[in-house]
Amino acid sequence: MRTPVSTYRLQIRKGFTLFDAAKTVPYLHSLGVDWVYLSPVLTAEQGSDHGYDVTDPSAVDPERGGPEGLAAVSKAARAAGMGVLIDIVPNHVGVATPAQNPWWWSLLKEGRQSRYAEAFDVDWDLAGGRIRLPVLGSDDDLDQLEIRDGELRYYDHRFPLAEGTYAEGDAPRDVHARQHYELIGWRRADNELNYRRFFAVNTLAGVRVEIPAVFDEAHQEVVRWFREDLADGLRIDHPDGLADPEGYLKRLREVTGGAYLLIEKILEPGEQLPASFECEGTTGYDALADVDRVLVDPRGQEPLDRLDASLRGGEPADYQDMIRGTKRRITDGILHSEILRLARLVPGDANVSIDAGADALAEIIAAFPVYRTYLPEGAEVLKEACELAARRRPELDQAIQALQPLLLDTDLELARRFQQTSGMVMAKGVEDTAFFRYNRLGTLTEVGADPTEFAVEPDEFHARLARRQAELPLSMTTLSTHDTKRSEDTRARISVISEVAGDWEKALNRLRDLAPLPDGPLSALLWQAIAGAWPASRERLQYYALKAAREAGNSTNWTDPAPAFEEKLKAAVDAVFDNPAVQAEVEALVELLEPYGASNSLAAKLVQLTMPGVPDVYQGTEFWDRSLTDPDNRRPFSFDDRRAALEQLDAGDLPASFTDERTKLLVTSRALRLRRDRPELFTGYRPVLASGPAAGHLLAFDRGTAAAPGALTLATRLPYGLEQSGGWRDTAVELNTAMKDELTGAGFGPGAVKIADIFRSFPVALLVPQTGGES
């Protein structure tokens, strides 16, 4: 198996095709990248910016460059000695435009007789054997249907007609009644849908890749990539949606000839990948959470908790109660169709009614501490969730006791489907709701993180990295992705608030006075986001504010927006640009946070790039990138600027200040090059401790062994507190051999070396043992 040393994620779309990606390969190679990492490239919904709505898995998307474009990327990568990692989406396909998806079109036209009927997860027993499509403004809109060009039309929506169901002059409403599908009002999707989706997205229909024939057809193009040596590895999107993730990975490993595989699996604290999973690890959110938290000041927790409580009227937020509520909001709302389907699968001899079963199943899911179980290994997790659900709702105890053995029986469809459903609820209830409500420090509410873990001390951080080296050395590490709520540099700046909680509280109170918003917790989220991403355009901040408010769902929401509140929200954001006093407050806050945020950014980047695992660089983040949630994190950027800056660095033109964005490029390029060119320096993991008054502000580790020292990473943590306490002073680190800083070229040691000398230019350093000819 070929494995990567590092990757660089590129978002492939119509505006940046595979041919464009091929042209970036020389720059990526110069940057030090080992593998090119591509977003989904199979044919997707026309105009899709992300590619996760695949409509035809049999071909590379023509809009994205087609098979010729993929061949161009692969050829360029091979010429540079690089590999290719590609993102694939086995869980679902895009069905927004049925005519673009031949599988879905066939299903709608032929129903159960379609060759693709088994490919989709349809409950045919509901709705009289028809597929319910929630596309109408209301059920009354059936009168708006038309027959045109041999198709059923609803405004711009087109649907096929089954053979023999239409004769000239037939009323469209009557023709509709004869189809294998039923068009319904969009609001009915919450309770009456009968096909599995990706989360609550009606236009993404679940696919049953657990069926061998479906797997084969869905992966024929993917298999070609490996047969023709176009790709080296795969990133698997949303494996938790699959009926049998373990079986899927085993089959995928076989058909790709033993390729490198990563899964987009979010691990909760303490959770481990099942040993039976044939993959190299995750896409790195677990690493992101660890890196963020070691740069957060634990002393900020108490004052930020107090502030959060005051914003809630004096009562502190109980996170477990909160997520129980937000998950029930999802099970009883946008995913209730899925819960009802589970309830219909409960055997009659269990003596549990549909209503009681749905309530009990939802309560068990709300008690889940992880996204899903993988039975039989996860049996204890399921049992504990059942116990917690019964304690919370004693009146459901009998139903829960009846359900537990059924949910543990892997031969039952109920158990398999329950496992597919719990992850959806976790994602929507926690990531997409609670993370917009629990706002004491925005850094903590990131994908894959547990926001109740406020900070991680260095000794615990080192223990986690040592485990990573021992157990998952080929798992990905990351700081920014297309899914992160805030980019790495936005979070790094927000993290400084943990060191200046008092100043933050005063600034927030002034901003709330100047631009009132009747939702205290949301105001904290909003002003932290603005401070973290500043400078930003009015349009970006308005979009983020509205999305955050609707996701939180307290003062407004997506299905029933609150115009009065949203107008106040808009006014608060406008005030940043139109009210000099508000703008002055924001700029003063940013001025306070920025230098320490830049230090945090460099520390996080160097640590992530050199820690155990396979580091990924998300496109463009070798420069400062202060993005917010999608689609803000997919904005266009210039490779030309980065290429020119890298050439300047290589010519010896180093940044004069560590706040210069070229410093981040310097750190990124030197770390990536070293990992690629000197792999022998990254074979182990040993914590390195400093001595002296500021030892706690140094995070350092040696990637070698006791017998053979390797690359030595040194990074500043809690830089504001360091400055306030008088700086590094006599704090020193012991070097066993002479070493050179890859960032500056300066030499140090052997012996005790002051940290202030090592960090004379930048708040981070990457030291390597000097060879005999170096001085």
UniProtKB/Swiss-Prot annotation:
One of its GO terms (molecular function) is (1,4)-alpha-D-glucan 1-alpha-D-glucosylmutase activity. SMART domains: Aamy (SM00642). It comes from the Bacteria. Pfam families: Alpha-amylase. SUPFAM superfamilies: (Trans)glycosidases. Coiled coil: none annotated. Keywords: Isomerase. The keyword Isomerase applies. One of its GO terms (biological process) is alpha-glucan catabolic process. Its EC number is 5.4.99.15. It catalyses: 4-[(1->4)-alpha-D-glucosyl](n-1)-D-glucose = 1-[(1->4)-alpha-D-glucosyl](n-1)-alpha-D-glucose. The keyword Glycoprotein does not apply. Catalyzes the conversion of maltooligosaccharide into the non-reducing saccharide, maltooligosyl trehalose (alpha-maltooligosyl alpha-D-glucoside) by intramolecular transglycosylation. Monomer. Belongs to the glycosyl hydrolase 13 family. This is Maltooligosyl trehalose synthase. It comes from Arthrobacter sp. (strain Q36). The lineage of its organism: Bacteria, Bacillati, Actinomycetota, Actinomycetes, Micrococcales. The gene is treY.
